[in-house]
Amino acid sequence: MSRFLICSFALVLLYPAGIDMYLVGLPRIAADLNASEAQLHIAFSVYLAGMAAAMLFAGKVADRSGRKPVAIPGAALFIIASVFCSLAETSTLFLAGRFLQGLGAGCCYVVAFAILRDTLDDRRRAKVLSLLNGITCIIPVLAPVLGHLIMLKFPWQSLFWTMATMGIAILMLSLFILKETRPAAPAASDKPRENSESLLNRFFLSRVVITTLSVSVILTFVNTSPVLLMEIMGFERGEYATIIALTAGVSMTVSFSTPFALGIFKPRTLMITSQVLFLAAGITLAVSPSHAVSLFGITLICAGFSVGFGVAMSQALGPFSLRAGVASSTLGIAQVCGSSLWIWLAAVVGIGAWNMLIGILIACSIVSLLLIMFIAPGRPVAAHEEIHHHA
């Protein structure tokens, strides 16, 4: 079992590492490529576009051909794209490399969640996804620090060679450690069950909405945090970094505590708690009389996301024993596109950073609470259908 957990965690980590590690080198990259930092900031969106494009096909291929045939090319593409970025001499080539990086990371991301669905029952999967959420919270803090240390002695290209090295490690895991977890092709008697695993299932769609809104909350916070903390609240750059590190610490602490909470409380209780924390954060930020109260509201955001997201993802994947790859892809596409669409629309309409965050917090909590209360899980999948054993 440990091999599946290690491989899944490694496959997921390519996604945040690809986002956060290169940011510290952005000024030097812009200077070397004769581009402005503003022009290269689109590299974030290009990377996410690559991930979304990968998810359009990766899930279906993983369900038909297996998890390894998607993970291995995905890791290989991430390696090649990282080297391509390091060799880029124009901003256009650099952005093309970032898109290819996103394609590779997207393939690995989809496979990671499909593997967890294949190998864990509902309760254990919720615990593991909460732990995974805690680990991914470390990356936005550690990756820029690692990038800074690398750039003290080496040029910016070394950041992408480091990513390529990570990709090589994950490729080796996928080749030699990971075993195939895709369920055997269904017998004729199982065809009705395969056909019943519809993506239009009300329960699945409700969890897609909940997780997409939750990701929109956390990405809105990440995108608006420099404006909120430095421009509006007046913190210096060093103080901003400290606050972000502390919020990541809150996220990690809550994420690592959630598996223990699942041993005491029902998953539904934790999901309701998550949305109540979002609502409390929105109200706190809306009426905050001081910076200290606002910072408390920000910690509620991190706690709310960490306590509920892993549980909601586990519930979303629960109905899909034979189509876990497609379900994982659908979740990923909805989360990436939905959150990006909200942030873009809010910017186009001219909603300020503060109101943008408050608005998504309150909308997410109200919509999600209604869905949690009125759309309950269907019939649990039987134990022999839930966990697939492999040699």
Swiss-Prot record:
GO biological process, one term: response to antibiotic
One GO CC annotation: plasma membrane
GO MF, any single term: transmembrane transporter activity
Alphabetic keyword roster: Antibiotic resistance, Cell inner membrane, Cell membrane, Membrane, Transmembrane, Transmembrane helix, Transport
InterPro entries for this protein: MFS, MFS_dom, MFS_Efflux_Transporters, MFS_trans_sf, Multidrug-R_MdtL
Record-annotated membrane-spanning stretches: 4-24, 42-62, 69-89, 93-113, 131-151, 158-178, 203-222, 243-263, 269-289, 293-313, 331-351, 356-376
Endpoints of the signal sequence: none
Any matching Pfam family: MFS_1
Topology versus the membrane: Multi-pass membrane protein
Cited SUPFAM superfamilies: MFS general substrate transporter
Superkingdom of origin organism: Bacteria
PROSITE patterns: MFS
Compartment(s) of residence: Cell inner membrane
Function: Confers resistance to chloramphenicol.
NCBIfam families: PRK10473.1 (NF007782)
Membership in a protein family: Belongs to the major facilitator superfamily. DHA1 family. MdtL (TC 2.A.1.2.22) subfamily.
Protein name: Multidrug resistance protein MdtL
Provenance organism: Escherichia coli O7:K1 (strain IAI39 / ExPEC)
Lineage: Bacteria, Pseudomonadati, Pseudomonadota, Gammaproteobacteria, Enterobacterales
